[in-house]
Amino acid sequence: MSLSIDVTSLPSISSSIYKHESSSTTSTISGKSIGRSEQYISPDAEAFNKYMLSKSPEDIGPSDSASNDPLTSFSIRSNAVKTNADAGVSMDSSTQSRPSSDIGCDQVDFSLNRGIKIDAMVDSSISISTKSKKEKSKHETKNRKCYPKIEAESDSDDYVLDDSDSDDGKCKNCKYKKKYFALRLRMKQVAMQLIENL
């Protein structure tokens, strides 16, 4: 039996990642401000510090905080401004951290679009051939020796060896010759009895 597997193409994955600019909102940022359009309220640093230190941490609310995000709540005392909800929030606590003019400001226009293209094709074929096995079995059948069929009514004397059947007289004086003939006759009788019972 022969087994052949033909895989013409394995799965191929091709990915393309591309970037291009888009018309996202341009924001002016400085220091540690968040990435969206902000309106800054520039408080007096000393007045702000006095205001924040005069309040207990439990009394500080969203209007006093620089950020409502729990990840940045650690910066409430040092980097907060008082502003309303509609205006943007800033994490800058003093005017000194911001440049005095627009020259030093960073203009940010950023957008990332990612496209991934995946192509996968699997072509396979399996063929199983049993020709060699059949040819082998025919070859073995030809090599088998053909023995005479023993009929139930056949004469037992035809199947008893005599001295002429031996090779070069090797079995003429064999001490097991009598036992062999007796055993062969007994086996023949058992075979005949089995055939009759069937």
UniProtKB/Swiss-Prot annotation:
Residues 91-100 have a biased composition (Polar residues). One of its GO terms (cellular component) is host cell cytoplasm. The modification Phosphoserine is found at S67, S154, S156, S164, S166. Its cofactor is Mg(2+). Residues 16-37, 53-72, 85-104 are annotated as: Disordered. Mg(2+) binds at D92. InterPro entries: Rotavirus_A/C_NSP5 (IPR002512). O-glycosylated. Hyperphosphorylated on serine residues, when in dimeric form. Phosphorylation by host CK1 is required for the hyperphosphorylation of NSP5 dimer. It is found in: Host cytoplasm. One of its GO terms (biological process) is viral genome replication. GO terms for molecular function: ATP hydrolysis activity; magnesium ion binding; nucleotide binding; RNA binding. Pfam families: Rota_NS26 (PF01525). Signal peptide: none annotated. Plays an essential role in the viral genome replication. Participates, together with NSP2, in the formation of viral factories (viroplasms), which are large inclusions in the host cytoplasm where replication intermediates are assembled and viral RNA replication takes place. Orchestrates the recruitment of viroplasmic proteins such as capsid proteins to these factories. Participates in the selective exclusion of host proteins from stress granules (SG) and P bodies (PB). Also participates in the sequestration of these remodeled organelles in viral factories. Belongs to the rotavirus NSP5 family. Homodimer. Interacts with VP1. Interacts with VP2. Interacts with NSP2; this interaction leads to up-regulation of NSP5 hyperphosphorylation and formation of virus factories. Interacts with NSP6. Participates in the selective exclusion of host proteins from stress granules (SG) and P bodies (PB). Also participates in the sequestration of these remodeled organelles in viral factories. This is Non-structural protein 5. The lineage of its organism: Viruses, Riboviria, Orthornavirae, Duplornaviricota, Resentoviricetes.
